[in-house]
Design a protein with these regions (language model features):
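A short, polar/charged loop-to-alpha-helix boundary motif
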Residues: 71-77
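GIY-YIG nuclease catalytic motif and its immediate N-terminal context
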Residues: 1-35, 40-42, 49-52, 56-66, ...
Length: 80
């Protein structure tokens, strides 16, 4: 299983989108500052996730969620 996820920083309120095959481990890495783009912005809470059968599907969805139109739709869905 592969996951696409959205995290919210409890420190600055920003959202971060990513993909992984181990959601629990990846959230832990974000929270202890082991990731390049979110280092220093934690702690984080998981606010959204989707599950896919392949890495390719998850990577495509992650890329799509990071585009302008889809990012705005996701913000509306999440109520932000």
């Amino acid at each position: 299983m592969f996951y696409v996820y959205v995290l919210k920083s409890l420190k600055n309120g920003r959202f971060y989108t990513g993909s992984t095959n181990n959601l629990k481990r990846r959230l832990f890495e974000h929270n202890i500052g082991q990731t390049k783009y979110t280092k220093g912005a934690g702690p984080f809470e998981l606010i959204y996730k989707e599950v896919y059968n392949t890495r390719l599907e998850a990577n495509r969805r992650e890329k799509f969620l990071k585009t302008g139109k889809e990012r705005e739709l996701l913000k509306q869905i999440l109520g932000t």
